[in-house]
Amino acid sequence: MSAVTAAGYQAPQERSQSVTLPARPEPITLKPSETAVVVVDMQNAYSTEGGYVDLAGFDIAGAKGTIANIKKTLDAARAAGVQVIYFQNGWDKDYVEAGGPGSPNYHKSNALKTMRQRPELQGQLLAKGTWDYAIVDELQPQPGDILVPKTRYSGFFNTNMDSVLRARGIRNLVFVGIATNVCVESSLRDAFHLEYFGVMLEDATHHLGPDFIQQATVYNVEKFFGWVATVNDFCATVSQAAPTEA
């Protein structure tokens, strides 16, 4: 059986500083200083009972396990010197940023539709400064983490995300969060089009909709847009690069 060549870009003189992550469809080589974990929309809205997703009728039963796996991922990433970046989705309290009837977002956002169906919720869902908009308690950003607010599914649309990454020489993005098939996939696709190497940790994401939706995104990422790995493999791999005390 022939050896499998790892994907990913590394200059020859930098290979000794890199680690190789087991992934599908092939392993990928990552340099921790050129890698970021991107935490997508881990807000009360998407993962907590009483949040927008719950109120809109989606099943959030799997969110608790997703939170635990993301926490494990972030602990390992920070210990290895990997940058952590949070996306936080939402709009101003008057929903000007959400767009009016002339915007597709007005018609497709389930948060906006839920508030139109239930006027008593107006101003409570995904509005900046509300409980719904806040990052969940278990995954609060730590010193050194970066927070990128966004107003649409992709974290690259009308944000400074690309500039944040290029200023730090980051080429590899490891995606975790909710929802696999919406904001995670949208952001990973845009990362691909901007020449970033995208990895999705399949057991640190959660979908909205039937279970086959999760597998559809896994297939899309693995076959067309990036690489798919697991939390345990990521943690074991980056621990090889964790700084040691003198």
Swiss-Prot record:
For this entry, list what GO says about its biological process. Answer: nitrogen utilization; uracil catabolic process
User: Quick one: signal sequence residues?
Assistant: none
Sorted keywords for this record are: Hydrolase
Q: Which SUPFAM superfamilies match?
A: Isochorismatase-like hydrolases
Could you tell me which CDD domains the record lists for this protein? cysteine_hydrolases
InterPro entries from the entry?
Isochorismatase-like_dom, Isochorismatase-like_hydrls, Isochorismatase-like_sf, RutB
The record's region (Disordered) falls at 1-27
EC number(s) recorded for this UniProt protein: 3.5.1.110
What functional role does this protein have?
Answer: Hydrolyzes ureidoacrylate to form aminoacrylate and carbamate. The carbamate hydrolyzes spontaneously, thereby releasing one of the nitrogen atoms of the pyrimidine ring as ammonia and one of its carbon atoms as CO2.
What's the family?
Belongs to the isochorismatase family. RutB subfamily.
Protein name per UniProt: Ureidoacrylate amidohydrolase RutB
